Amino acid sequence: MASEIHMSEPMCLIENTEAQLVINQEALRILSAITQPVVVVAIVGLYRTGKSYLMNKLAGKRTGFSLGSTVQSHTKGIWMWCVPHPKKAGQTLVLLDTEGLEDVEKGDNQNDCWIFALAVLLSSTFIYNSIGTINQQAMDQLHYVTELTDLIKSKSSPDQSDVDNSANFVGFFPIFVWTLRDFSLDLEFDGESITPDEYLETSLALRKGTDENTKKFNMPRLCIRKFFPKRKCFIFDRPGDRKQLSKLEWIQEDQLNKEFVEQVAEFTSYIFSYSGVKTLSGGITVNGPRLKSLVQTYVSAICSGELPCMENAVLTLAQIENSAAVQKAITYYEEQMNQKIHMPTETLQELLDLHRTCEREAIEVFMKNSFKDVDQKFQEELGAQLEAKRDAFVKKNMDMSSAHCSDLLEGLFAHLEEEVKQGTFYKPGGYYLFLQRKQELEKKYIQTPGKGLQAEVMLRKYFESKEDLADTLLKMDQSLTEKEKQIEMERIKAEAAEAANRALAEMQKKHEMLMEQKEQSYQEHMKQLTEKMEQERKELMAEQQRIISLKLQEQERLLKQGFQNESLQLRQEIEKIKNMPPPRSCTIL
């Protein structure tokens, strides 16, 4: 299920019961399993306008989304159908069918507004389905588009301006597709044939004037032009007679109106070819889990009496994914270290070199799976955890070395200790005989490979544990004069002091190596962070340029149509977008 989802039928994603929006947890589980990028196509429109038929066609099925055959609206809430994309391998097509707007049985305009807003927020292609032509009645029925700024926030800051809203809406909002059912007019304008797209643009033309009627006429048209600069229109003839309409999903295509069948084929082909993957600000690609998070965040805001905020949704998603990215990076680091390290290592440098390689790759894993890490909070957490893991490996390495050396010493010196117990060395000349045997075994110990970092430390500790025995043998050896015993004791003290100094120097060296490695770690974090932020900056600048380009096209249209004031207003918006501060540069961790 991880790569492809095979839903045999649609499932309710957001239930609309008793004027409350409730998320279906089973639908969320399905979204969680979709690791592929998702192309989200949502359709809205008045009830009983045939939305579900088009969505079934996109799913490649005759039935699925409920069509119904009466004046009652069948679809309640938002229904979801996830299918493999028929034309783009590696992508999943998520179809969202919504309940009919302005259902007389429901009588709740506010819920219609939220359904409309959610469809816009969740989709990469937004289809508005209506019956007949684009006249003033059709525009009045599309009043929801004029309320989008009252239903959706693009930024979380309370002082956000309409210009900021408009710019961010263009960056977030989907392609707008208007499907006109049972269309019976000839597509002509001023006596010349026009395309459905040209018909849409003609219908969105503004009227000059400042009276209330003109403002009312222009408002929905301005909103569509402003928020949806990428627009498409499809017209559909009536599919058949009234009897056929009541059982449309069961009728063979060759029994339907030929023009209607061709128009549906053209529509589905466009959606499959040109509907893009759902993305968020900064070019963030949405997959199943990310879509799930958006659904939860938006519905939670609505149910709490707040406006769904696009920025907050992205930041919430970033919190979830960045936390998971830290864990993914740490898991990768541990797996690589455990696979490649052979403990105990002979030197600390050997372990630190491996740590540095695995750490660099772990940071790459984090960078690949994270985004919008505000103030590098999660990268700092990753750095702290990697340092702790490094220290744990250093300790484990030393512990394993200590245990191995302890076992080796016990094995090598076992016979010598047995001889001591038997009194072999309690005789004249016994001390130097003991010392000779001890030095032979010490040499064997030193020559034995694979002891690790604690080799000298453990040898010193072992000898320290036997100091009383050596001291006793020295004092009891009657072949030695007091002067010779004194000289030997001084030698032993000097050796002990030298060993202590070596141990101290080794500790200092270890500390310096760890500090140097910490600096290298910091530099690696900064290097990858700088590269990622530069890439994100380029993506944001490209997105800003795309928004400006779309607005410039709209400004040019307004200018050509003689709307100087509206064109000037849009020009001012464009200049404000251009003067927006660039994404902030990298900060020190």
UniProtKB/Swiss-Prot annotation:
PROSITE patterns: G_GB1_RHD3. It is found in: Cytoplasmic vesicle membrane; Golgi apparatus membrane; Cell membrane; Cytoplasm, Cytosol. Disruption phenotype: Mice exhibit normal T-cell, B-cell, and phagocytic cell profiles in the spleen and Ly6G(+)neutrophils in peripheral blood but macrophages show impaired killing activities. Infection of Gbp1-/- mice results in severe listeriosis or M.bovis BCG-induced morbidity owing to massively increased bacterial replication in the target organs, whereas wild-type mice can control the infection. A lipid is attached at residue 586 (S-farnesyl cysteine). Residues 1-309 are annotated as: GTPase domain (Globular). Residues 587-589 form a propeptide. Induction: By IFNG/IFN-gamma and CpG oligodeoxynucleotides. Up-regulated upon infection by T.gondii or L.monocytogenes. Isoprenylation of mouse GBP1 is incomplete. It persistently exists in the cell as a mixture of C20-modified and (more predominantly) unmodified form. Isoprenylation is required for proper subcellular location. Its main location: membrane. Residues 35-276 form the GB1/RHD3-type G domain. The modification Phosphothreonine is found at residue 587. Interferon (IFN)-inducible GTPase that plays important roles in innate immunity against a diverse range of bacterial, viral and protozoan pathogens. Hydrolyzes GTP to GMP in two consecutive cleavage reactions: GTP is first hydrolyzed to GDP and then to GMP in a processive manner. Following infection, recruited to the pathogen-containing vacuoles or vacuole-escaped bacteria and promotes both inflammasome assembly and autophagy. Acts as a positive regulator of inflammasome assembly by facilitating the detection of inflammasome ligands from pathogens. This is Guanylate-binding protein 1.
